[in-house]
Amino acid sequence: MSTCGNCDCVDKSQCVKKGNSYGIDIVETEKSYVDEVIVAAEAAEHDGKCKCGAACACTDCKCGN
């Protein structure tokens, strides 16, 4: 996952930045792949903008493109 420099999260490393495409990295295990697909789907719900990851404390992460 990449970080978002303009994310409102306290821990910017928990912010996921997705563009217009579903760039999914297949990691070592099937579980990791499923997690990435879920993250991509959640990001798509927010118009492809950054969204806090599951471990981020904030609930309304507002990132620009």
From Swiss-Prot:
Keywords: Metal-binding, Metal-thiolate cluster
Keyword flag Endoplasmic reticulum: no
InterPro entries attached to this UniProt entry: MT3
Signal peptide annotation: none
Family statement drawn from the similarity comment of this UniProt entry: Belongs to the metallothionein superfamily. Type 15 family.
Function: Metallothioneins have a high content of cysteine residues that bind various heavy metals.
Protein known as: Metallothionein-like protein type 3
Lineage: Eukaryota, Viridiplantae, Streptophyta, Embryophyta, Tracheophyta
